[in-house]
C-alpha cells in the first residue's frame, strides 16, 4: 500500500482537515439559509439568488461527503464494504464537478444580469436562467458519466501490502488504470476544465471592462458633486471578480499539488495538501458572499437577536 495510508497517524493533519470541513459546512449552511429565506420572502425571486443558494447547497453536500470520507481516513470505526466505498467516492467526485459547473455558470449568469442595456448580452437576460438550467442539467449528466469509472476502479483496501493500489481511505483504494484509459480520462477532464475556466475568464474579462466603465462614471459624478457611493452593480461586480480570482488561484495551486503527488508516488503530505486545496474554495467562497452582502449579515443579526431575547 502507498505511503498515504500513514495519514491516520498524524493528529495535526486530522485537526486541520476536520477544521476546514467544519468551517466550510457552517459557512455554507449560513449562506444557504439566508438565501433560502430571501427567496421565500420575495414575490418574484431573482435567478441569481436561486443559483447562489444552489451553489452553497452543492458545496455543503460536498463538504459533508468529504467529512464522511475523512472519518474513514483518520478514525475508521469499521471497514467499509465495496458498495459504501464506491457510493461515497462517486458522490464526492460528482459533487466536485457540479460545484465547478455551478461556479462557472453563476459567473456567466451574473455577467449577463449586470450587462448594460446597450450590451450584446441584453437579449439573453430573460432567457439566461432557462439556458443556465439546461446547461447545468447537461453537465450533471456529463459528470455522472465521467465519474462512472469510480464504480469499477474503487475497491476495498486489500490486506496485503502493494504499491499498485492508490490509497483513498483506510477502507478504500483505487485500482491502477491502463495507460490508454488513463490518457483518455485525463483528456476528457482537461477539456472539461479548460472549457469551464475559459468561460469564466471571458465573463470575468467582461466584468473588468464593466467595472472600469463604472469607475469612469463615478469620476464624472464626483466632478458634478453627486454621490460617489458604490452602486449595487459595482459591489456585485467586485464580489464576482473576487470569487473568480480566488477560484483561479486555488485551482492552479491544487493542480500543482496534484501533479506533485503523482510525481512523488502518492506521498501522504502531498495527498493531504491536495485534499485541503481541493476543498478550500468551497470553504472560503461563502465568506465572500456573507461579508459583501449586508442583507445576509442583517438576517443573521435578527436571528441571533431573537434567540437572545428568548
From Swiss-Prot:
The chain crosses the membrane at residues 13-33, 51-71, 94-114, 136-156, 191-211, 239-259, 270-290. It is a multi-pass membrane protein. Residues 34-50, 115-135, 212-238, 291-310 are cytoplasmic. Its main location: membrane. One of its GO terms (cellular component) is plasma membrane. Coiled coil: none annotated. It is found in: Cell membrane. Expressed in a subset of sensory neurons located in the apical layer of the vomeronasal organ. The keyword Oxidoreductase does not apply. The keyword Cell inner membrane does not apply. GO terms for biological process: response to pheromone; sensory perception of chemical stimulus. Keywords: Cell membrane, Disulfide bond, G-protein coupled receptor, Glycoprotein, Membrane, Pheromone response, Receptor, Transducer, Transmembrane, Transmembrane helix. Glycans are attached at residues 81, 159. Disruption phenotype: Mice show a disrupted pattern of axonal projections to the accessory olfactory bulb. Mice lacking all but one V1ra and V1rb gene (12% of the V1r repertoire) show a lack of chemosensory response to a subset of known pheromonal ligands and changes in maternal aggression as well as male reproductive behavior. It holds the Pfam family V1R. Disulfide bonds join 85-172. It comes from the Eukaryota. Belongs to the G-protein coupled receptor 1 family. This is Vomeronasal type-1 receptor 49.
Amino acid at each position: 500500500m502507498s505511503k498515504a495510508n500513514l495519514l491516520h497517524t498524524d493528529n495535526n493533519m486530522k485537526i486541520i482537515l476536520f477544521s476546514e470541513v467544519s468551517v466550510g459546512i457552517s459557512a455554507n449552511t449560513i449562506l444557504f439559509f439566508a438565501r433560502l429565506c430571501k427567496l421565500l420572502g420575495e414575490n418574484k425571486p431573482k435567478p441569481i439568488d436561486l443559483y447562489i443558494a444552489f451553489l452553497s447547497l452543492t458545496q455543503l453536500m460536498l463538504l459533508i461527503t468529504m467529512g464522511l470520507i475523512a472519518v474513514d481516513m483518520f478514525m475508521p470505526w469499521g471497514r467499509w464494504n465495496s458498495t459504501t466505498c464506491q457510493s461515497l467516492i462517486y458522490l464526492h467526485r460528482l459533487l466536485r464537478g457540479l460545484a465547478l459547473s455551478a461556479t462557472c455558470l453563476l459567473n456567466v449568469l451574473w455577467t449577463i444580469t449586470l450587462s448594460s442595456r446597450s450590451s450584446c448580452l441584453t437579449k439573453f437576460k430573460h432567457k439566461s436562467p432557462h439556458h443556465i438550467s439546461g446547461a447545468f442539467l447537461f453537465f450533471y449528466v456529463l459528470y455522472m458519466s465521467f465519474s462512472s469509472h469510480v464504480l469499477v476502479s474503487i475497491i476495498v483496501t486489500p490486506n496485503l501490502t502493494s504499491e499498485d493500489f492508490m490509497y483513498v481511505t483506510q477502507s478504500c483504494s483505487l485500482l491502477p488504470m491502463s495507460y490508454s484509459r488513463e490518457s483518455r480520462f485525463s483528456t476528457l477532464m482537461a477539456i472539461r476544465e479548460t472549457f469551464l475556466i475559459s468561460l469564466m475568464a471571458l465573463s470575468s474579462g467582461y466584468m473588468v471592462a464593466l467595472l472600469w466603465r463604472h469607475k469612469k462614471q463615478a469620476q464624472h459624478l464626483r466632478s458634478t458633486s453627486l454621490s460617489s457611493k458604490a452602486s449595487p452593480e459595482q459591489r456585485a461586480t467586485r464580489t464576482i471578480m473576487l470569487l473568480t480570482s480566488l477560484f483561479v488561484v486555488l485551482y492552479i495551486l491544487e493542480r500543482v499539488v496534484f501533479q506533485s503527488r503523482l510525481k512523488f508516488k502518492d506521498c501522504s503530505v502531498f495527498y493531504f495538501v491536495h485534499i485541503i486545496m481541493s476543498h478550500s474554495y468551497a470553504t472560503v467562497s461563502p465568506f465572500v458572499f456573507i461579508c459583501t452582502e449586508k442583507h445576509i449579515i442583517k438576517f443573521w443579526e435578527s436571528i441571533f437577536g431573537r434567540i437572545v431575547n428568548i
